[in-house]
Amino acid sequence: MRAAIMALLLTTGMAQAAPTSYSLQPEASTVGFETDFGPDKITGRMPVTQADLRLDFQQVSASTIAVTLDVTGAQASFPFAAQAMKGPKVLDSGEYPTITFKSTAVKPDGDGVAVWGNITIRGVTKPAVLHAVIYRQTGTVAGDLSHLTIRLTGSVARSAFGATGWADSVGDEVRLDIIARIARVD
């Protein structure tokens, strides 16, 4: 993201002086996940109910992200998997209807940034790191920072949060692939 942000700044001729607020475009964004299911994969999506995104293009470390996901709206590639995932042995959406992530640090990392933060699943909070890369959205002109796309990737071990149901057939690692389309708040 550092290289992408620097390229964006060089093409604009102006730098942002402080963190800029962005709103999520939920209809164009996806929080995707994947885990192993024997020789197959279970894939799915979860809707975002709230997002507070502040990006600082001069000082990346001043950027902050806070997101809330709706566990009750989760979908999976196998019909029974969504029901099992939301049930008491895995995410327990009746007791814990949301998953939250709040950044604690944003640091340059290769051609992107590492977003350090705390993720809360099933009422258990653990540290997590996501890798992020930022792009201008298709159809925007060079230097236009009003509409951006952020791709975040990472993984969590579901057992660390007590989501241990069907451990004999479903993998522990849940791989995340998040596409967040955002618009600057003026």
Label for each model-derived stretch:
Residues M1-A7:
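Sec-dependent signal peptide recognition
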Residues A17-D186:
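Low-complexity, acidic/polar, glycine-enriched regions of mature
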Residues L8-A17:
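Hydrophobic h-region of N-terminal signal peptides that target proteins for export
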